[in-house]
């Protein structure tokens, strides 16, 4: 009687493995497909001016649109490097943090940068990366910097965090190499 039970259990286990394999279950996932949309496409980035991190030269269009050569800074360089890794073009929009968060929520932006700290008030509305560096800001205090992305788009955020870790020399545990 035990042998048929073991055979049945093995058959169920094998069937379960086949079903899960057929589902192509990938973790982490992006419910809205942000990473897939950006790869080989366009990375839509919202930038709020913050000296050294995001600098903007010239006129900003009425919808916040700027040409690629109008934006510079350390975070702009990080974003451009990430886009290169994904084979994507970068499209920048300049606005306030609040407006950028609104645009991420509505799906018209993939990422927001601009000296945003880990104490950001936006974490209940959008996804926040792990801190990727620590800097002293104008208040004289150390702050951990993060980037903002669509809430729940974990594959996109994970890929961004891996890029930031590689560029900044961090390991998964957050320590330098």
Question: Which residues make up each language-model segment?
Answer:
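Extended ligand-binding regions for polar small-molecule ligands
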Residues: 24-25, 76-85, 138-177
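Bacterial N-terminal signal peptides that target proteins for export
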Residues: 1-12
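Acidic, polar ligand-binding/catalytic clefts
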Residues: 24-29, 93-154
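Extracytoplasmic small-molecule ligand-binding "clamshell" domains
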Residues: 30-115
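Short glycine-/acidic-enriched loop or helix-start segments at secondary-structure transitions
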Residues: 55-57, 122-124, 159
